[in-house]
């Protein structure tokens, strides 16, 4: 094994190692999730060297510099003030979802008008219209961090893979017998997973365009799906009230997480893959040990259905969005509620942390998106202007751009 | 509502839930009818650029009513909403005689759609509060409704504005929910 280069990863903090093994170029990461501006650099570098043989004595200085750079980034207080940059009359029917590439240079919008459009974030110009689906384009994704491909899942039961640069369609994945409503690339960008109202999920090979495996076992619609950070496991959340953990290479069921007493609305892994967070219409979120599949905590407090939930990038914090019009922040370690976000005048259907982890973005049926302080729960900004409810909203990786997509057929760029 | 609740309404409804598709030309009064059904304010209604969904309880049924915009440019997208439809409600502006031919054409095309085959159809002859409104019988004849053989159908005169006739139509809907020939 020979180390070729070291790269920084800001969110969550870490160092990426590119190395050669048996003539093949590989990468792995050293996660520094606990890093803070006050961490002692020399001690930390010593610890890294103890566990990582690739970091030899000759690399000490370089690693120390990288850690210091990460600390500087953590010190930079992210308090970006957003203003409306552009309104895009994006589609002739309501939007479904929006997604940004990692660089934030472009983003995509899906719509009831059966298209997905690719936009230039800096100018607001339309770059491509991805046409070909015969029904609503519902689920969309970039293959981040690469960002050169786009996957679209449609109510027409197919998924299409596109070039982000040219807008050319590489493959149409056929096989589902009902609407595709969720999808994700694996982190290596070799496979795309689709979840469907037909109660199955399927994995597709990006190169060949062939189906790899079908995940069968759910008794009702699959509406949420995500890979873990390594891409080895995948979880599916279903209207059958359960979440299933699957082995992504064999398609075998690893665990069934049983405990919620209503439909699942979201299911995802924490960054270090130790925990699984599930949100449900039963008004609670549950935390599960990802290895054993046992429930370790139930997060209560909401008065109505949980419509979305998420971890921050390091996995230390959890945010929940509810039909009761409030959102909550929980500590993932103590499982205690830290703050309650109050102010929306309608249900909150989307919530996400900025990559820095100090701000939350919520989208609501009250036609506004809001920016919140994670620690105090104070609403810092109301992003107003949409004339119908907001279906989707997202931060870019730098945390200084927000895209909102609405039922009013438009999307807005805030920066 | 949010995307998630759209998915929940999309799935094949349990027995007591009914999926109703509300279609018709632009300015026929579909959204006004929807709001009248939901007992909501109808004073500020603008052309629908997409869709509206409302759930109404009636005679033990939960009626999930999908109101889809009727402007010409979005009519090609109606078919996106056909799946799992239990009842089709077609709304006509009875006072807009110039467009009877156009509305008849659209209805004929809908009735030929495979995904809507055998789905009971209720035609609302709306805007009967206007003096110039054509009576339901005249509209039925103009649209050749009596030639429909593959499903149950009904025409009901109404005014979405005043609410007159709307409940009669919905009573017919509840009676014919299960009339979809399999």
From Swiss-Prot, chain A:
Keyword terms, alphabetized: Cell projection, Cilium, Cytoplasm, Cytoskeleton, Flagellum, Repeat, WD repeat
WD repeat ranges, renumbered to this chain: 90-129, 132-174, 175-214, 217-256, 259-298, 301-340, 343-384, 386-415
Gene Ontology molecular function: any one: ubiquitin-like ligase-substrate adaptor activity
Gene Ontology annotations for the cellular component aspect, listed alphabetically: ciliary basal body; cilium; cytoplasm; extracellular region; motile cilium; SCF ubiquitin ligase complex
GO terms under biological process: cerebrospinal fluid circulation; determination of left/right symmetry; epithelial cilium movement involved in extracellular fluid movement; establishment of localization in cell; heart development; intraciliary transport; outer dynein arm assembly; protein polyubiquitination
InterPro entries given in the database record: G-protein_beta_WD-40_rep, WD40/YVTN_repeat-like_dom_sf, WD40_repeat_CS, WD40_repeat_dom_sf, WD40_rpt
The organism's place on the tree of life at top rank: Eukaryota
Compartments (UniProt record): Cytoplasm, Cytoskeleton, Flagellum basal body; Cytoplasm, Cytoskeleton, Flagellum axoneme
PANTHER family: F-BOX AND WD REPEAT DOMAIN CONTAINING 7, WD40 REPEAT PROTEIN
The protein's role, per its UniProt record: Required for axonemal dynein assembly and ciliary motility in ciliated organs, including Kupffer's vesicle, during embryogenesis. Facilitates the onset of robust cilia motility during development.
Similarity field: Belongs to the WD repeat WDR69 family.
Full protein name: Dynein assembly factor with WD repeat domains 1
Highest classification ranks of the organism: Eukaryota, Metazoa, Chordata, Craniata, Vertebrata
Curated annotation (Swiss-Prot), chain B:
Record has Aminoacyl-tRNA synthetase as a keyword: no
PTM annotation (Phosphoserine): residues: 5
Entry annotated with the keyword Nucleus: yes
GO molecular function: GDP binding; GTP binding; GTPase activity; magnesium ion binding; microtubule binding
UniProt topology in membrane: Peripheral membrane protein
Binding site for GTP: 24-31, 48, 67-71, 126-129, 159-161
One Pfam family from the record: Arf
One Gene Ontology CC term in the entry: ciliary basal body
Coarse class of the protein's main subcellular location: Golgi
Domain of life, source organism: Eukaryota
PANTHER family: ADP-RIBOSYLATION FACTOR-LIKE PROTEIN 2-RELATED
Name of this chain's protein: ADP-ribosylation factor-like protein 3
Native species: Rattus norvegicus
Upper classification of the organism: Eukaryota, Metazoa, Chordata, Craniata, Vertebrata
């Amino acid at each position: 094994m020979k180390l070729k280069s070291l790269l920084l990863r800001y969110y969550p903090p870490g160092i990426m190692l590119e190395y050669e093994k048996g003539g093949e170029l590989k990468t792995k990461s050293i996660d520094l999730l606990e890093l803070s501006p006050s961490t002692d650099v020399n001690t930390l570098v010593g610890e890294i060297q103890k566990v990582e043989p690739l970091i030899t004595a000759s690399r000490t200085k370089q690693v120390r510099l990288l850690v210091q750079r990460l600390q500087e980034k953590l010190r930079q207080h992210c308090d970006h003030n957003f203003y409306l940059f552009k309104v895009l009359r994006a589609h002739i029917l309501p939007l479904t979802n929006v997604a940004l590439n990692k660089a934030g240079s472009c983003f995509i919008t899906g719509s009831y008008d059966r298209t997905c459009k690719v936009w230039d974030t800096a100018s607001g110009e339309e770059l491509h219209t991805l046409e070909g689906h015969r029904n609503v384009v519902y689920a969309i994704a970039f293959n981040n961090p690469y960002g050169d491909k786009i996957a679209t899942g449609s109510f027409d039961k197919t998924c299409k893979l596109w070039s982000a640069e040219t807008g050319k369609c590489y493959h149409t994945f056929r096989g589902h017998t009902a609407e595709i409503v969720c999808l994700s690339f694996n982190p290596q960008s070799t496979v795309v997973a689709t979840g469907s109202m037909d109660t199955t999920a399927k994995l597709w090979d990006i190169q060949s365009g062939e189906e790899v495996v079908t995940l069968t076992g759910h008794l009702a619609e699959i509406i949420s799906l995500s890979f873990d950070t390594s891409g080895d496991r995948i979880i599916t959340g279903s209207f059958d009230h359960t979440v299933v953990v699957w082995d992504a290479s064999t398609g075998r069921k690893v665990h069934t997480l049983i405990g919620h007493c209503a439909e699942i609305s979201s299911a995802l892994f924490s960054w270090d893959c130790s925990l699984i967070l599930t949100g449900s219409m039963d008004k609670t979120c549950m935390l599960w040990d990802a290895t054993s599949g046992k429930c370790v905590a139930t997060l209560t407090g909401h008065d109505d259905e949980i419509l979305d939930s998420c971890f921050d990038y390091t996995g230390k914090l959890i945010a929940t969005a509810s039909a009761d019009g409030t959102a909550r922040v929980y500590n993932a370690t103590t499982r205690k509620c830290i703050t309650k976000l109050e102010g929306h005048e309608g249900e909150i259907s989307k919530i996400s942390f900025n990559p820095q982890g100090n701000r939350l973005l919520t989208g609501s049926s009250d036609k506004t998106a809001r920016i919140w302080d994670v620690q105090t729960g104070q609403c810092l900004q109301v992003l107003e202007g949409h004339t119908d409810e907001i279906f989707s909203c997202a931060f870019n990786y730098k945390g200084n751009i927000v895209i909102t997509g609405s039922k009013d057929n438009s999307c807005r760029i805030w920066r | 509502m949010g995307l998630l609740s759209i998915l929940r309404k999309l799935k094949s409804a349990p027995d007591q839930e009914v999926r109703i598709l509300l279609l018709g030309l632009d300015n026929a009064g579909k959204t006004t009818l929807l709001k009248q059904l939901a007992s909501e304010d109808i004073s500020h209604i603008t052309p629908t650029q997409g869709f509206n969904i409302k759930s109404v309880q009636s005679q033990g049924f939960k009626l999930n009513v999908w109101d889809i915009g009727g402007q010409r440019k979005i009519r090609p997208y109606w078919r996106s909403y056909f799946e799992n439809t239990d009842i089709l409600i077609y709304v006509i502006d009875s006072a807009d005689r110039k467009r009877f031919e156009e509305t008849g054409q659209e209805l004929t095309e809908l009735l030929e759609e495979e995904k809507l085959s055998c789905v009971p159809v209720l035609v609302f002859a709306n805007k009967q509060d206007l003096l110039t409104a054509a009576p339901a019988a005249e509209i039925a004849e103009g649209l050749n409704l009596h030639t429909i053989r593959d499903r149950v159908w009904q025409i009901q005169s109404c005014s979405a504005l005043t609410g007159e006739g709307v409940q009669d139509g919905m009573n017919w809907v509840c009676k014919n929910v299960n009339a979809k020939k399999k």
